[in-house]
Design a protein with these regions (language model features):
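Core, highly hydrophobic multi-pass alpha-helical transmembrane subunits of bioenergetic inner membranes
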Residues: 1-164
Length: 164
């Protein structure tokens, strides 16, 4: 994900450094709550993600949405920087590069879709002894809900951000 994001920044930086900086800021704001939730839910591997729903269903849904936002799926926040970059490339008459970037972003989308599929649609074989993880109350930082909302639903603020 970060490697793909660096590619987007490298392409747009010579044309518009402001868009590149906005891209990294949005990416950081999306990554922080994602990693924070993964740490709280003790998720390290794809195998851990198959049983994430047993720890906290709500946190699992939020993590799934944040993964989709990181992938750049519209209408989530992660789509905004890609849209701005593609727009800048087209305005600079670099349509072939914009097309190539858009097509290559499908690889990143595939990775995140596979991860969200594993998290939401599959269950590993279980025995009655290990059917459910212990449900300890997860204590989240008070800032986490705000960060989650910011990482998912900032696209309506895009016109205001780009005019600054």
């Amino acid at each position: 994900s970060s490697l793909a994001n660096i590619g987007w920044m490298m392409v747009v930086f010579p044309l518009s450094p402001n868009i590149a900086v906005l891209n990294i800021i949005i990416y950081i704001f999306m990554s922080i709550p994602t990693f924070f939730l993964m740490e709280k839910m003790t998720l390290k591997t794809l195998q851990d993600m198959t049983t994430a729903w047993t720890t906290s269903t709500t946190a699992n849904i939020m993590l799934t949405l944040m993964f989709l936002s990181l992938s750049g799926l519209p209408p989530l926040t992660g789509f905004a920087p890609k849209l701005l970059i593609l727009n800048q490339l087209v305005m600079e008459n670099l349509t072939p590069i914009a097309t190539l970037m858009a097509i290559m972003s499908l690889l990143n989308l595939f990775f995140y879709m596979r991860t969200t599929y594993v998290m939401t649609m599959t269950t590993p074989p279980t025995s009655p002894q290990n059917m459910m993880k212990w449900r300890h109350k997860l204590h989240f930082h008070k800032l986490l809900p705000t960060l989650i909302i910011a990482s998912l639903m900032n696209i309506p603020l895009l016109p205001m951000i780009t005019t600054m």
